Swiss-Prot record:
Pfam families: tRNA_bind (PF01588)
RNA-binding listed as a keyword: yes
Subunit structure: Homodimer.
Domain tRNA-binding: 8-110
Protein name per Swiss-Prot or TrEMBL: tRNA-binding protein YgjH
Superkingdom in the source lineage: Bacteria
Sample GO molecular function, one term: protein homodimerization activity
Phylogenetic classification of the source organism: Bacteria, Pseudomonadati, Pseudomonadota, Gammaproteobacteria, Enterobacterales
Gene field: ygjH
Organism: Escherichia coli (strain K12)
Record's signal peptide: none
Record-linked InterPro entries: NA-bd_OB-fold (IPR012340), tRNA-bd_dom (IPR002547), Tyrosine-tRNA_ligase_regulator (IPR051270)
């Protein structure tokens, strides 16, 4: 396992987020376009959680979000952040990371 200096880890801005909008991507069977409230702003992510969660299960969910990921285009949509998940090696299961207790959107994860 490769080690990472604390200074590099500290550059990651992870925050508690609340999913405020979910819709299926029109041109991709396994993608959702998700709006996440991370406190001071709302970020959009394109995520491949369709096999694991329904839109109803995602809506309103409190999650852990990597906020300062470089923007990327996924099937024509901008993804500005990443929802953090635990995933099995074979990809058969993916579970969103959530705070143990309710925390407001925008709280920093350290």
């Amino acid at each position: 396992m490769e080690t990472v200096a604390y200074a590099d880890f500290a550059r990651l801005e992870m925050r508690v987020g609340k999913i405020v909008e979910v819709k299926r991507h029109e041109n991709a069977d396994k993608l959702y376009i998700v709006q996440v409230d991370v406190g001071q702003k709302t970020l959009q992510t394109v995520t491949s959680l369709v096999p694991y969660y329904s839109e109803e299960e995602l809506m309103g969910k409190t999650v852990v979000v990597l906020c300062n990921l470089q923007k990327a285009k996924m099937r024509g949509e901008t993804s500005e952040c990443m929802l953090l998940c635990a995933e099995t090696d074979d990809g058969s299961e993916s579970v969103l990371l959530t705070p143990e207790r309710m925390m407001p959107a925008g709280v920093r994860v350290v």
